[in-house]
């Protein structure tokens, strides 16, 4: 017993000693300053060499580090823009003062996007661009998101101030389905749209640490959508970037009062982050932007055909009765006067009016004038009630001796529309809120919860101009990560708010005071009556424009004028009534749920670097019938995928080979494999050639699959899944191509020819795919001169587009020639199709960064993209200038805290093709500039800046607003 007690006592003492030994920790404190300027360096990394322990300097450059290692220990200090430094600490009571030596950052930035693992940007196996925290801080653009537009290979499409869409390597547009945008690893797309809504949801400006851009194919690692690029936006860690920061930015736009009076611009941002202990930190942030948006003012005339509408040169409301203004809405309602007259005649005959038409034929054959025929009708009690139809019946009479046949010709007329400024909400704002909780479970495992919420009012250009009023989106993520693995789950919650369409709301207002049928009857009847001499005092020898003006004036009698109570009431009713109920409002509450994991086995597999990952997501579509065919309930779409990447360095690390492959599956489509192979060849220190073969794809978007949306002009967009062909019974009730219907109606000017009608074929959609080959070089020709060059060749297959068709409202195929003669008895449909023709594209880019003198940085890049061997008549929506370039010069500290930055961009003209309209977008150049002053003692910066400094208006795409100058001053506290 005594022996056992003695053993127990020994073991207990040993355990106490062991615990005490482990409890012996050392706390080290210090400060880091820039050795050149004496300024404190915040967010510098401090780690204990050979240990996982580490911390970051706070906003005053101070740090406190606790370690269980015995003294002496070696601290490793690192930060972008400084040389890595090691300091030995022998005494814990010693305050460590580090004088950090600045170094050139050219080519030394660490990027993750290229391979999902950290590497120097010089050693990336594929093309990549990076925007650093310092570049964001010193950019003249008012938003960090706009700074992307100065990168090599990037185009920006501006639908409105807060809705800008970056694109690379072609296929520009408002909302890019071939471009991924990830914020802290979360796909930033709106679930109902399948593309990112600009920067309406995402990081506040003071919470952005960096942005990384992969131009070109990136599906091998990032999945569907990465056909033309992937953008990664990374936030600041609350462990690394601490303290209170705020920025107040105010300015003006519309200074020349070209579109409206001078308007104020406000942008207020705040961020607070705190490390409460070595294990726990948090951050919160908010940003509010308010501005009077750029306005859509293009009044050029469109020739509309439901899918690709083109411009009519010189057309105006005054000289074109069928005028359809680009940024004018409500004039999409159009009808052929001849077809309308024929419809009136057919209705009369169906009601037993053969004696009436027979009498007219007889009078015309007898040589009576229209006035004489009217007198005959007035004197005959049996014919008198039908006198009102004479303007329709005389021009459509089949009498052999009818000099008035063809009076209407092939002329169509449209209703009088409303300018965009009366229909779209230009009171743009964007409120972003963010919060994050980070907890270190161990020295190597971090748990985090992040939430980003955004709401705002903006405008988006798709098949229509959509007023995104009070749009709301939230993204919420749980993540566990370590050095070599992560697990994350997140959701995107979308709420369309009070969003609505401009065209549908304008049509609603017009129809509120007079139906389309009544309006066209008044117009056609008045026009014909005037031309036939049936209106007293109106001669028949006047120019045709006079008769059209007379007809429009008569038809527009009682029209609601903008600003009147009648207009406002009708407009409000349109905005507050769901599209599915005949209004213009969206009612979307679609969500996305995503799960993802990644594991790096490089430490376990010694002979090759191994990376693998998998993901799964679910779309939950819920638009209450305002976008999707979901009136019966929510629609679920599941996707899952997995990827594998292998990397191997050979020949004394002069050659690095990377191979990756990904497989993805969507519920509605066959699985897709996307391999990628690349080689990085070191030809000298910090000089590398890269070669790559990449593949990419995109599944048809949620709208491509399930849309069922009634748009302007009674046109319905439908999805491309087989269920739509079944629901709409295309097999038993065929639809006809839009162009054949146009040709058929035009034949009514002489002899109607139903043989012109061509049946359209509904085919099931397939995913798009592409293959790309690239060669590039990136290297330092000196420590102060970085060059990057690339050339690529790509081949695209199974382009997704739309085909316009129509069919009779009666549902009886035998009546198709009768129904299709009039727009009032025709249902217009547009369904998704794949192009059978592959398309080839080539492109190149060249850029350099040159530290010419002290801190002066000169940058320049030029790039071009174009399609090859495009068959005549194929619509590609490529929408890309053949050539563009960027020039920049800046210095953040010219003298005593003063700095500046100037950027100039020029791009070639574009032959734009879009569902909203098609036409030439002129070439333009724009100058952005800013002057800054650092208040170093309080780590603050004052900026005076301007974008489009010369205020020369330009347009980035067809139908979008012209962008003028924005001038601002800002003050930022604790921003460097």
Ranges and model annotations:
Residues 650, 786-912, 972-974:
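Gram-negative outer-membrane beta-barrel transporters
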């Amino acid at each position: 017993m005594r022996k056992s007690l003695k053993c127990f006592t020994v073991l207990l003492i040993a355990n106490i000693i062991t615990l005490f030994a482990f409890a012996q920790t050392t706390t080290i404190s210090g400060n880091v300053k820039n050795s050149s300027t004496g300024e404190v360096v915040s967010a510098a990394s401090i780690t204990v060499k050979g240990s996982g322990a580490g911390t970051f300097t706070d906003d005053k450059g101070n740090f406190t580090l606790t370690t269980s290692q015995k003294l002496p220990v070696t601290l490793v200090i690192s930060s972008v823009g400084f040389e890595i430094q090691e300091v030995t600490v022998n005494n814990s009571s010693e305050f460590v003062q580090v004088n950090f030596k600045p170094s050139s950052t050219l080519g030394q930035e660490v990027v993750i996007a290229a391979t999902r693992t950290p590497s120097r940007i010089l050693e990336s196996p594929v093309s990549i661009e990076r925007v650093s925290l310092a570049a964001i801080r010193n950019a003249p653009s008012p938003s960090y998101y706009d700074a992307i537009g100065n990168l090599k290979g990037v185009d920006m499409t501006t639908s409105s101030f807060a809705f800008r869409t970056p694109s690379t390597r072609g296929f520009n547009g408002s909302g890019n389905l071939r471009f991924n945008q990830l914020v802290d690893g979360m796909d930033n797309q709106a679930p109902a749209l399948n593309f990112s809504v600009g920067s309406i949801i995402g990081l506040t400006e003071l919470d952005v640490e960096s942005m990384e851009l992969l131009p070109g194919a990136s599906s091998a690692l990032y999945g569907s959508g990465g056909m033309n690029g992937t953008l990664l936006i990374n936030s600041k860690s609350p462990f690394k970037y601490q303290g209170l920061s705020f920025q107040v930015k105010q300015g003006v736009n519309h200074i020349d009062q070209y579109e409206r009076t001078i308007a104020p611009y406000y942008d207020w941002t705040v961020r607070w982050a705190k490390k409460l202990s070595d294990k726990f930190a948090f951050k919160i942030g908010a940003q509010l932007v308010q501005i009077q948006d750029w306005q859509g003012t293009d009044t050029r005339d469109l020739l509309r055909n439901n899918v690709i509408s083109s411009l009519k040169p010189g057309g105006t409301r005054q000289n074109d009765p069928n005028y359809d203004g680009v940024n004018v809405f409500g004039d999409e309602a159009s009808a052929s006067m001849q077809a309308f007259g024929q419809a009136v005649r057919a209705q009369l005959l169906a009601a037993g009016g053969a004696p009436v038409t027979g009498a007219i034929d007889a009078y015309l054959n007898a040589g009576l004038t229209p006035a004489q025929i009217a007198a005959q009708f007035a004197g005959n009690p049996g014919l008198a009630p039908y006198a009102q139809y004479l303007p329709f019946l005389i021009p459509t009479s089949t009498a052999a001796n009818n000099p008035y046949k063809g009076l209407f010709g092939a002329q169509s007329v449209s209703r009088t529309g409303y300018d965009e400024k009366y229909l779209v909400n230009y009171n743009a704002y964007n409120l972003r809120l963010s919060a994050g909780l980070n907890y270190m479970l161990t020295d190597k495992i971090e748990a985090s919860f992040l939430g980003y919420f955004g709401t705002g009012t903006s405008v988006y250009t798709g098949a229509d101009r959509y007023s995104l009023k009070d749009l709301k989106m939230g993204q919420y993520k749980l993540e566990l990560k370590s050095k070599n693995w992560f697990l994350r789950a997140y959701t995107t919650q979308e709420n369309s708010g009070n969003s609505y369409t401009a065209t549908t709301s304008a049509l609603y207002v017009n129809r509120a005071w007079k139906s389309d049928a009544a309006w066209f009857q008044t117009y056609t009847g008045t026009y014909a009556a005037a031309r036939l001499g049936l209106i007293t005092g109106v001669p028949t020898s006047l120019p045709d424009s006079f008769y059209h003006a007379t007809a429009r004036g008569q038809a527009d009698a009682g029209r609601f004028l903008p600003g009147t109570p009648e207009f406002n009431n009708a407009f409000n009713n349109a905005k507050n009534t769901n599209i599915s109920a005949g209004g213009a409002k969206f009612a979307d509450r679609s969500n996305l749920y995503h799960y993802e994991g990644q594991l790096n086995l490089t430490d376990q597999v010694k002979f090759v670097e191994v990376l693998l990952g998998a993901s799964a997501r679910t779309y939950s579509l819920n638009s209450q019938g305002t976008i999707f065919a979901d009136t019966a309930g929510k629609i679920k779409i599941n996707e899952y995928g997995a990827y594998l990447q292998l990397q191997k360095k050979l020949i004394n690390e002069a050659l690095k080979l990377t191979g990756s492959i990904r497989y993805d599956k969507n519920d509605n489509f066959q699985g897709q494999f996307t391999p990628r192979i690349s080689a990085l060849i070191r030809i000298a220190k910090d000089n590398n050639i890269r070669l790559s073969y990449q593949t990419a794809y995109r599944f048809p978007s949620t709208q491509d699959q399930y849309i069922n949306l009634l748009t302007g002009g009674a046109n319905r967009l439908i999805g491309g899944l087989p269920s739509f062909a079944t629901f709409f019974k295309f097999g038993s009730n065929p639809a006809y191509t839009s162009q054949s219907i146009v040709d058929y109606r035009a034949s009514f000017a002489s002899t109607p020819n139903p043989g012109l009608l061509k049946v359209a074929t509904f085919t099931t959609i397939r995913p798009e795919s592409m293959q790309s080959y690239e060669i590039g070089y990136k290297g330092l020709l000196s420590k102060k001169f970085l060059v990057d060059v690339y050339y690529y060749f790509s081949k695209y297959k199974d382009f997704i587009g739309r085909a316009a068709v129509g069919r009779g409202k009666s549902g009886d195929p035998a009546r198709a020639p009768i129904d299709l003669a009039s727009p009032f008895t025709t249902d217009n449909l547009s369904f998704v199709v794949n192009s059978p023709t592959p398309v080839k594209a080539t492109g190149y880019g060249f850029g350099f960064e040159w530290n010419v003198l002290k801190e002066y940085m000169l940058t320049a890049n030029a790039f071009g993209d174009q399609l090859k061997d495009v068959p005549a008549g194929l619509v590609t929506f490529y929408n890309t200038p053949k050539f563009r370039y960027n020039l920049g010069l800046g210095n953040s500290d010219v003298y005593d805290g003063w700095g500046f930055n100037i950027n100039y961009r020029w791009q070639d003209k574009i032959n734009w093709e879009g569902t909203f309209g098609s036409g030439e977008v002129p070439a333009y150049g724009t100058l952005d500039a800013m002057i800054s002053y650092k208040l170093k003692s309080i780590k603050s910066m004052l900026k005076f800046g301007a974008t489009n400094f010369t205020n020369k208006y330009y347009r980035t795409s067809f139908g979008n607003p012209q962008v003028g100058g924005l001038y601002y001053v800002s003050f930022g506290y604790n921003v460097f």
